């Protein structure tokens, strides 16, 4: 089984690490928009494989969703955090665009993918993906 995690920040990297450590799948693909970020996180996580006792392959990519092709499950953690003074509506407006774009790219390469949404505000983003 293949799992994609979109967003290689603290939440996404932790999610990818947990999935790998529990041997839920044979491959995890980390995707991020920051150049080289997902690749670096993937290398860091792979270097812990022998210590943590997993053999799940972890790779990273900068926005190349073709690498996610054939994913069975995808976890969307991407989006901006709510900043001081920012309204919920402003957060929804920004993160909705991000989540829509991510979802379209995931479904394009893995039409049967099951999507789990962790981006805030979670209730609205999950409804948007549905």
Residue ranges and their predicted role:
Residues 88-130:
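Rossmann-like NAD(P)(H) cofactor-binding subdomain of soluble oxidoreductases
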Residues 8-9:
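Glycine-rich Rossmann-fold phosphate-binding loop(s) that bind the pyrophosphate
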Residues 12-13:
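N-terminal Rossmann-fold NAD(P) dinucleotide-binding loop
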Residues 78-80:
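Conserved NAD(P)H cofactor-binding loop of Rossmann-fold oxidoreductase domains
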Residues 19:
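Aromatic pocket-lining residues of Rossmann-like dinucleotide-binding sites
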Residues 33-71:
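Conserved N-terminal Rossmann-fold NAD(P) cofactor-binding segment
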Residues 1-3:
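Extreme N-terminal starter segment of soluble prokaryotic enzymes
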């Amino acid at each position: 089984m293949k799992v994609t995690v979109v967003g290689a920040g603290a939440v996404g990297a932790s999610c990818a690490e947990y999935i790998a450590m529990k041997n839920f799948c044979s491959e995890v693909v980390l995707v991020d928009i920051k150049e080289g970020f997902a690749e670096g996180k993937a290398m860091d996580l792979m270097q812990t494989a022998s210590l943590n006792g997993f053999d799940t392959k972890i790779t990273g990519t900068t926005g190349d969703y073709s690498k996610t092709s054939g994913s069975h499950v995808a976890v969307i953690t991407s989006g901006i955090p709510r900043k001081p003074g920012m309204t919920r509506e402003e957060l929804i407006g920004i993160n909705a665009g991000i989540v829509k774009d991510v979802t379209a790219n995931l479904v394009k390469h893995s039409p049967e993918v099951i999507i789990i949404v962790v981006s805030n505000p979670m209730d609205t983003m999950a409804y948007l993906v549905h």
